[in-house]
Structure formats: C-alpha cells, structure tokens
Amino acid sequence: MGGLRRTSKKSINLGWRNASFRGFADYMQTTEFFEGLKELNILIKKSHRVAIMCAEAVPWRCHRSLIADAEIARHVVVWEIMRKTSARLHKLTAFAKINRNKRPIQIYYP
C-alpha cells in the first residue's frame, strides 16, 4: 500500500497541495488500494492490532495518515504512535470528504 504514487491528470484530490499526497490520494481510488485495505482489515480482525510503519517519524508527513483516513471512513479506530509511551487517536483530515453511498466507501480530498 505504500510507496510514491503519481498524481492523475483527472485528480479529484486537488485539496492536497503536496503532489506526493495527492498522488497517494488518487491511488486510494483504485481497485489495488481497496484490495490492500481489505487485506489490512483481515489482519486487524485476526489480531485486533496492526501497526503500519514508515520512514517518516510523524504521521502527518506520511501516507499513513491517508490510510488512517480510509480506515476511519470505515469506522476503524486508528491510533498514531508517536513514541514508545505516547499515542493519540487519528483525526480525519480536515478537508477530507467521505462518500458512503459508493461501494467500496470512497474518501477524497477536493
């Protein structure tokens, strides 16, 4: 689910000024992303806890925050681990929009 993604010319995620975040948000509209999210949720159901890690130390500088938004849209509780002894609940990105009428549930950033 990770990695640098290119933005689409038909992007619906123009709220992201950062091209790499917009590219990942565009990727979040694909079948490949939804399949990865489905696998992640199977792991969550089996173990009740899953950690997603990346090179960036803080979630708001990483695509993990977008994955967390997608999970929140599906009513999954997401904790951001800041340090060994510090965690906080992830809050949906302020300009995110959720379309629960579409299946799978769509999240985008206009």
Where are these regions (language model features)?
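Residues lining hydrophobic/aromatic ligand-binding pockets adjacent to catalytic sites
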Residues: 1-110
